[in-house]
Amino acid sequence: MRDAIRRVEHFSIQVPNTPAKAFGVLSTLVSAGINLLACSGVPRGRRAQIDVVPDDTRRFRSAVRKAGLAFTPRKTGFLIQGNERPGALAEHLQKLGERNINVTGIDALSAGEGRWGAIIWVEEDAVRTAARVLTASAKAPAGRAPRRKAPPARRASRAR
């Protein structure tokens, strides 16, 4: 089975680094029916940064606007999900490297039950090219380049 690849957007918000603030933000998203593909948080001095990758960016933007949450867009990346196998992530990184696309970050993990997932972040000016490269690698069996359709055979012209 081939890996599923889709473009994703990353958003960030800073809140006071106090108990239950992250819960308050996340419960607001839950109440709005927002599904998150990824979420992480880190302390930033007296503040805490919450980073999220929503499943539906348009719906997320609408919900945070209505709730008055000050999420800011940060970067664009690619969510890759598939069956676990040795070198699964490396296959995609190799394709990007061959096209001289710099990867600025990777978040990867085992999803359990033989599945894995990763988000690969690239520079904004490389998003379109990376999308083409990753989509092509998703369509080809592992370790092989996509097959190209052979041009139709030409008939030899007859001399009259």
Where in this protein do the model-derived segments appear?
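A conserved regulatory-domain signal marking ACT and ACT-like small-molecule sensing domains
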Residues: 1-160
